[in-house]
Each structure stands twice: as C-alpha cells, then as structure tokens.
Amino acid sequence: MIKVRVPATSANMGPGFDSIGMAVTLYNEFAFKEINTGLKFNGIPEEFCNEDNIIYEAMKYCFDKADYKFKGLEISVLKQDIPISRGLGSSSSCIVGGLIGANEILGGKFSKDELLEMAVEIEGHPDNVAPALFGGIVVAIIENNKTVYNKIDIKNKVKFITIVPDFRLSTEKARQVLPKQISRADGIYNIGRAALMISCFLTDRYDLIRSACNDALHQNYRKELIPHFDDVYNKCYELGALGCYLSGAGPTIMAIIDNGAESFSNNIKQYLKDKDIKWRVLELQADNKGAVLIKGDC
C-alpha cells in the first residue's frame, strides 16, 4: 500500500495572482494499491466513486504518459483535513496525491519536475500544484508551454492564521467576477508588490509585508462574494496582523502574524463569536517539504 501526504496550499498570495503559492501545515492523506481488477474507493462519498474522480483521473493521466495498462486500482482517502472549495488547494492535493501514487506504482519512473508538468496540464495553472509538490513558497510561470518555477523555504519567524468561512466558493464562480482586461496602472501596482513580497520573505522584512500583500487584480472583485470579508480583513490588521490577503479564489482569509504573537488567534476567534460569524480559525505554519510518502501506519 502506497501512502501519500499532501499539504494545503494558499495561492494568489497577495499580488501574486496565478503565480505565487505557499504550502501550509494542513493535510490530506491518501493510500493507493494496484488490484487485480476494477476500481475500489474507500473514505470517499459515493457520488465521487467513479472514473470522474479527480484522484483517479490524475493517476490514469500518469499511467497513460508511461503507456502503462494497470489492472485495477484501490484508492483510499485516509485523512481529509483540507476543506473543499475554500481557497486552500483541495483539488490540487488530490491531483498531486494521485500523480505521486501512480508514479510509485510505476516504480518512480517520473521526476518531480515531470509530475509538476502533468499536474499543470490537469489543473491548468501551477500556483497550487507547485507548492503542494515542493512545499514552501513557489513562484511559477508558464514559458513556451513549460513550467518555470523557483522555491523559497519560509523561516519560522511567521505563522499563518487561516480563517475559513462556513460556505464554499467555487473557483469558476470566483473567476466570473473578474474583469476581462486590466489597466496598466493595476498591472504595475501588482508587479511591484509581488516583487516586494518575495523580497520580504527572503530578507525577513516582515515589517513591509502589509504593503506587499495589497492587490488590484482579484481581491476587490471577489470579496463581494464573501459576506463579512471587509470586517474580518480589517479586524485582522487591527489585532496586529503583519499582512492579510484572500487565499486562492476565496473565501478563506489568510493572516500573516509574528510567530511570537500568542493572542491573535484567540482574539480573532472571540471577534467572530461576538459577531456571530461562524468561521473556523486555524493556526498553521509553512510546510517546506511538500508532498511526501508516508512510512508505516497513518
């Protein structure tokens, strides 16, 4: 039995729309086994127990690349801590998990870079699948139909308070509210801040991260789909967040805080309770390892 752990990811970091993503310490875990015949699912809702399952599709994609005719597959979800359609890379975790599982069945035929290309071909963009595979912050672009990326390990000087709403927001719906064209001013606004964000993490200049988190390409449009967004976002800064941004396509809000700030989580939880906003608050660290094989029992 092959077991794989894949981290949640926070894409569209601040101004890094479709290009900067980060892995955090929240996980889905999967198990895979080739069987004599058929397709068997464990720990998966009945409606997804078919050949349209995204995990199965990723595995088959990998097998097809290797021209490998598998007999049958048993696919198990051992842990599903990454919430679905919340802007934390749940679908990417399934794609990456399936590709790694298939590659292990193939005896490790493909490199991680080759698995990344497959993941991007399936997902359509690299900003979730790349950090899910490699961990840390990953800056990734598509150049001549190839993924070009660079990974940055995140030091433990900051942690990430992940504020998860009690409703789903599909990426498709969140895409529909975006403008088809942007102004030169908005493009320049984001380019400068994306560069600043990366430099902040490289040089520990977290005092600058607030300016670096600002965005003109997607957050102001998508926040209209998220009740209480402005109130919670502004409260995070009031309580001392170093930076704050909409994670992925939303609706999750990610707050970056100093690793020694002990009271922030309790204070934002109390604020949500007082306002009767039934959102979850998770205190996470950066995951610099990315997807890994699990040894022994899960």
UniProtKB/Swiss-Prot annotation:
GO terms for biological process: threonine biosynthetic process. It comes from Clostridium botulinum (strain Alaska E43 / Type E3). Pathway: Amino-acid biosynthesis; L-threonine biosynthesis; L-threonine from L-aspartate: step 4/5. It catalyses: L-homoserine + ATP = O-phospho-L-homoserine + ADP + H(+). One of its GO terms (cellular component) is cytoplasm. ATP binds at P83, I84, S85, R86, G87, L88, G89, S90, S91, S92, S93. Its main location: cytoplasm. GO terms for molecular function: ATP binding; homoserine kinase activity. It is found in: Cytoplasm. InterPro entries: GHMP_kinase_C_dom, GHMP_kinase_C_sf, GHMP_kinase_N_dom, GHMP_knse_ATP-bd_CS, Homoserine_kinase, Ribosomal_Su5_D2-typ_SF, Ribsml_uS5_D2-typ_fold_subgr. It comes from the Bacteria. Pfam families: GHMP_kinases_C, GHMP_kinases_N. It is an enzyme of class 2 (transferase). Catalyzes the ATP-dependent phosphorylation of L-homoserine to L-homoserine phosphate. Belongs to the GHMP kinase family. Homoserine kinase subfamily. This is Homoserine kinase. Its EC number is 2.7.1.39. Keywords: Amino-acid biosynthesis, ATP-binding, Cytoplasm, Kinase, Nucleotide-binding, Threonine biosynthesis, Transferase.
